[in-house]
Amino acid sequence: MPQLRDSGTRSLHATEPVPSAEMDGFCRIFGVETEYGVAVTGAERPVDAGQVAMTMFQPIVSRSRSTNTYLTNGSRLYLDVGSHPEYATAEARDPREALAQDLAGEHVMRNLALKAQRKLRESYGAHATIHVFKNNVDSAGHAFGCHENYLVRRFVPLETIEHQLLPFLITRQLYTGAGRMTPDGFQITQRADFLDEAVSSATTRSRPMVNTRDEPHADPDSFRRLHVIIGDSNRSQWSTWMKLAVTHLVLCAIEDAFRHGTPSGFEHCAFADPAAANRTVSRFLDDPHAELTLESGESVSALGLQRRYYAAVKAFIETHVDALASSLPATTIDTIMGEWSRVLDALERGAYDALADRVDWAAKKRLFDALKRRRPDVTFAQMEQLELDYHDIANGRLYGSLVARNQMRELLTGDNVEYAVHNPPTDTRAALRGRFVDAALNVGAQFSADWTHLTLTAPERREAILLDPFEAEPTLGFEQLMEALN
């Protein structure tokens, strides 16, 4: 195996290359990282959010001696900078599986919050309530993220990601944006006012839309991990699934173009000013026909540019039907394209209410519009509270009531989510990681893990390296590790 050349450390040594069997096709690894916001209301005295987050993670620390751990479903659970609980899904081959793992993260966070709430009430009163927000901006204006991860063939240059993919990522927010009420009006995205660069390797001193730090968590000679920052955290299951699914198809077209030296159809889509275009798209409802300036000097609306991407992807699919069909185990290409076409048609008609059962911003807009009709004197602060309730996965009621009244589509059942809480995807290396973590916990062994390593730290150190994220079959090193564990 080659040396793993991640940024920061490129210290994984091995003896021979292990090329992935999936390098030549369109199969992909998907992942979603979600940072959650934490707040407390009803306490008899002030409670620090960091203290609440640590209380939530106390069961994790007791079990793993750390606030950074991997779970039996292969996912990562940890406290991020600023006391934001974060959940990173296990590697998935299909958007539907990635959605299940993301919802499992909601389930885990909700359980941690409700257990911590019971403990908190012993010291802060019976009405102390923990809120865990799956959103991207808090009431003080601090932004935090939802990051998508896509494994991309390394022969695609980063410049192409910026020029051909980024315009798609910006304009897909027409149907994947979570929406946000601001003092100046309603925006269809949460983070447009906070993202200031197109691409960058930094995430602290700048806020890029795509992060280029080279950490593939795979064979670095074959793949790069595309780290998308621009997306919102979604409550809608459809939106989470859709943003992964359509982005996969666009990436397939880009990869195929570079593989064969042919045009992708996206060569002339780059924005002259991506940050300005992003802010304009976020204010789509102010002017749905607002023109965005391309590098070429041409102007096009956000919807018009999405139509171009749709047409190019449709033409690409017609000549790659079988290869694309085999790239996704649980999602059909016809389903993705049908949903994409219908949502673009609804946007063109201005039929935003027709999207309210699947698009977060449309659902929230319908709620706000109905509230303003009933109560013309409603204040911004009251609408802000309503919005926070929509995103509260611990004690919020609004989103659940929409689901209960069949006003929000669900793609997965409660049983699907419960299964994903305890079980990793079976067709990626997450299956091996989950098996190892489960066995180590059962015998009380000291261990550590990351995306490419599994380590037994005592009584003697043993390690297995899992460099291929597509490979779910045990390696010799993994089998030896499990023997030592047992």
Swiss-Prot record:
Superkingdom classification of source: Bacteria
> A Gene Ontology biological process annotation?
protein pupylation
Query: Is Ligase a UniProt keyword of this protein?
Result: yes
Positions with a binding annotation for Mg(2+): 33, 78, 86
Please tell me where ATP binds in this chain.
Answer: 76, 89, 451
Any idea of its EC number? 6.3.1.19
Query: Which key words tag this protein in UniProt?
Result: ATP-binding, Ligase, Magnesium, Metal-binding, Nucleotide-binding, Ubl conjugation pathway
One GO molecular-function annotation for this sequence? ATP binding
Please name the top-level EC class of this enzyme. Answer: ligase
Q: In which pathway does it act?
A: Protein degradation; proteasomal Pup-dependent pathway; Protein modification; protein pupylation
Miscellaneous: The reaction mechanism probably proceeds via the activation of Pup by phosphorylation of its C-terminal glutamate, which is then subject to nucleophilic attack by the substrate lysine, resulting in an isopeptide bond and the release of phosphate as a good leaving group.
The record's similarity note reads: Belongs to the Pup ligase/Pup deamidase family. Pup-conjugating enzyme subfamily.
Stored NCBIfam families: pupylate_PafA
Function field: Catalyzes the covalent attachment of the prokaryotic ubiquitin-like protein modifier Pup to the proteasomal substrate proteins, thereby targeting them for proteasomal degradation. This tagging system is termed pupylation. The ligation reaction involves the side-chain carboxylate of the C-terminal glutamate of Pup and the side-chain amino group of a substrate lysine.
| Name of the protein in its database record | Pup--protein ligase
From which source organism is this entry?
Bifidobacterium longum (strain DJO10A)
